[in-house]
Amino acid sequence: MLSVSCPRVYMSRKALDFGQLASCRCRWAGRSGMRVAPRRRMPCVCFVASPSQPGLAAVDVPAEAISSARTTTMIPERISVSSLLEVVSDDLLKLNNNLKSLVGAENPVLVSAAEQIFGAGGKRLRPALVFLVSRATAELAGLLELTTEHQRLAEIIEMIHTASLIHDDVIDDSGMRRGKETIHQLYGTRVAVLAGDFMFAQSSWFLANLENIEVIKLISQVIKDFASGEIKQASTLFDCDVTLDDYLLKSYYKTASLLASSTRSAAIFSGVSTTICEQMYEYGRNLGLSFQVVDDILDFTQSAEQLGKPAGSDLAKGNLTAPVIFALQDEPKLREIIDSEFSESDSLATAIDLVHRSGGIRRAQELAKEKGDLALQNLQCLPKSQFRSTLENVVKYNLQRID
């Protein structure tokens, strides 16, 4: 079973090899001055980490553990984002009210940009995951409510994500996002780049004020990973020798790193054991990889109206994603077309057809489900609650997009 890892063991810059499955019991820790929730000792499972090759990880899980966690193939009903995140709706409402004020009012252009960015809405999935993990782990530590650190962490994560979108729109020369004109379309490239830089800097300032060195290192690494992912993508355009490992590592940098670091940080602020924190990191990593693979599948299976951009646009730019990488293994003609950088008028349409006919879409779907199943396994060490159930449903929501 193939799985990419963070290129470090949190702070040590080494890879993770999640191998032998072990069992553990959840630790309970009371907080002074606070009533500790009733003690329940619940068996749970966790992974034991050991050094491995940089950037890669292998997972060896007993069959019975997989069968108990593998529920992604049966989704009884469609899940909507609004209903999915209802359990943390109050937390998200508070976050929305705070976001614009966090940007500050020093510069009218930045204020206007903040209105444009945060006013566009969005699912707020990343801060929602912070709240869900925070509340799912809080019971283990006897916390009755989330801390101010949990709340500020969610705000920081959304600011970092938004800053990355501003820069992505500049790099991709995108004119619209969420139905609104992008910052660089309204104010020009220079202002957009500076606005993104400002939001990265502002989020870093709030991050430093959390005064937790482990969380500071985790989230700071995310910003570095964003740049690494963009550079890796730019250096492999139209490269038919790009491997699945290369793709997964790039996807970790661009998507999964933020999710993994934010879910682990949420658990850290709950004060739970290192084992639980590691599992929350792996949940975010596997979920992030699954999300990226699904997005890359939709680039071939949805219409331009659904995508908000032409179908196959990543392929047209030379960005070879999972469906293409799988298709290249069986379709030599596809390599010829990509090597020519679609010089013929109908070559892109032919390439898209080859990706479909080769089974590349099907194999990418299997990869997305594999990562989703791993994410579900990572949640097994949490006590059952509506928050754990919602974290499971986030995995299912993602996979139902390719049903």
Swiss-Prot record:
One Gene Ontology molecular-function label: (2E,6E)-farnesyl diphosphate synthase activity
Disulfide bonds: none
InterPro entries listed in its UniProt record: Isoprenoid_synthase_dom_sf (IPR008949), Polyprenyl_synt (IPR000092), Polyprenyl_synt_CS (IPR033749)
Catalysed reactions, as listed in the record: 7 isopentenyl diphosphate + (2E)-geranyl diphosphate = all-trans-nonaprenyl diphosphate + 7 diphosphate
Cellular component terms (Gene Ontology): chloroplast; plastid
Residue stretch of the organelle transit peptide: 1-62
PROSITE patterns per the UniProt record, alphabetical: POLYPRENYL_SYNTHASE_1, POLYPRENYL_SYNTHASE_2
Protein origin, superkingdom: Eukaryota
Enzyme class of the recorded protein, top EC level: transferase
Keywords: Chloroplast, Isoprene biosynthesis, Magnesium, Metal-binding, Plastid, Transferase, Transit peptide
Tissue: Expressed in leaves, stems and roots. Highest expression in leaves and roots.
Manner of cofactor binding, per the entry note: Binds 2 Mg(2+) ions per subunit.
Enzyme Commission no: 2.5.1.84
Major subcellular location class: plastid
Positions with a binding annotation for Mg(2+) 1: 168, 172
Compartment annotation: Plastid, Chloroplast
Protein family: Belongs to the FPP/GGPP synthase family.
Assembly and interaction partners: Homodimer. Interacts with FBN5.
Protein task: Involved in providing solanesyl diphosphate for plastoquinone-9 (PQ-9) formation. Geranyl diphosphate is the preferred substrate.
Protein name per the record: Solanesyl-diphosphate synthase 2, chloroplastic
